[in-house]
């Protein structure tokens, strides 16, 4: 009987401890679930995944056909996280983000960027890649009047959090060797830095046009999640040039007196 009472006492103590003592899970990781179902493995892969935390944690992976899954699962520390997924950066990608070499177009880069708070046992987010480049197509009504075009600006890529980064950007196009009717430049998402179009005419004169002013007057929004493409028409006249900026739905005509 004494042995039986002793066992009951021990059992009661275990129940009491199990109910009153809570496990401290502060040191346990948070499980991050990234829903990748919206990604296009055919046209957009491979994908570069970067996860960075406030306390120095880093996780990097390349997702391609061989290792791609609809849901990516990563154990992360319980703190603030910056999560990045890149597509289309190619050889321009490095540990600091994406850098566009001088003289090159921006690559067709798509970026998912999220700030997440991993403060529980798990956290989920849907990865949706956003278009971070603008195709600027320039048509010249009198191609014989122009030798070359150069687009230049002050954004030369993206930092590791996917924000436009400062640097010298310049792309040159020899009009005589391009397929008419248009020449296309690929521009990265912009910040407040100006953008210029240098036009070298057949007589050797170089004329510079403030593209940033024209694009702003047109109402173009560089902060949109997915950037629109633009079309520009240059029509040289005896007294100047008429610049027409067009998108799918809008048109702006600017007369510049030279």
Regions found by a protein language model. Name each.
Residues 19-258:
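Extracytoplasmic cysteine-anchoring/structural motifs
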